């Protein structure tokens, strides 16, 4: 096998060219001791951890496969983190999942009498540190949790970890876009090599666009409750 083909073989496991990961810093995280995330680390440079892009890609594929087994509306996607709000709303727009952004009211999963209560079969969170309420309620209800996790993320009640930068605007846009694309492919809504009509930049948080997404999401929630 030629060196060129070997290089091509090495790049094949990546969901998108490495340069895009680098542009978005989606594979970079602060250095922090976390034995659960250590296996995803490629190397450490100074005070930063570089996640293995191949392993990020593998976990996104695995998460997409798992999510594809659930009805879209029964997938609850959560983000209390500001830069995760637009990615979550866009992800739900293109996949049919149910979004919850901003503060996660106690009882959302555990109290059927609560306005805004959600019946979910699986929960996807943006960052376990700030989405702890959603994870705790999912645990009480025996609902599996998929989470994007950085080195400082608590993962005790996370069933499937997707390593990545959970703080950056571009990184969250790219991670959610990749997961949306792979989920649509798993469902057969896109062919294996087909690209969606939207790009990762469409998932990037912009306050003015977030307000429009939020209004649309509220309308969808009202229809679902009816």
What are these regions (language model features)?
Residues 2-4, 8-10, 14-212, 224-226:
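Ribosome-associated RNA-binding proteins
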């Amino acid at each position: 096998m030629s060196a060129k083909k070997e290089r091509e073989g090495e790049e094949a496991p990546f969901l998108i060219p490495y340069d895009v990961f680098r542009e978005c810093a989606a594979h970079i995280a602060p250095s922090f001791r976390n034995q659960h995330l250590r296996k995803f680390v490629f190397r450490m440079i100074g005070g930063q951890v570089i996640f293995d892009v191949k392993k990020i890609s593998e976990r996104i594929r695995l998460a997409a496969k798992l999510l594809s087994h659930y009805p879209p509306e029964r997938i609850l996607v959560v983000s209390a983190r500001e830069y995760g709000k637009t990615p979550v709303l866009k992800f739900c727009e293109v996949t049919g999942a149910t979004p919850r952004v901003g503060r996660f009211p106690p009882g959302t999963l555990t109290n059927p009498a609560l306005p805004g209560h959600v019946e979910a079969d699986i929960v996807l969170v943006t960052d376990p540190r700030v989405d702890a309420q959603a994870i705790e309620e999912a645990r009480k209800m025996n609902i599996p949790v998929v989470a994007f996790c950085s080195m400082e993320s608590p993962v005790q009640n996370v069933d499937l970890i997707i390593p990545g930068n959970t703080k950056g605007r571009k990184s969250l846009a790219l991670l959610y876009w990749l997961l949306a694309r792979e989920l649509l492919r798993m469902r057969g809504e896109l062919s294996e090599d087909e690209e969606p009509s939207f790009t990762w930049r469409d998932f990037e948080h912009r306050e003015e666009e977030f307000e429009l997404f939020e209004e649309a999401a509220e309308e969808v929630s009202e229809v679902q409750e009816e």
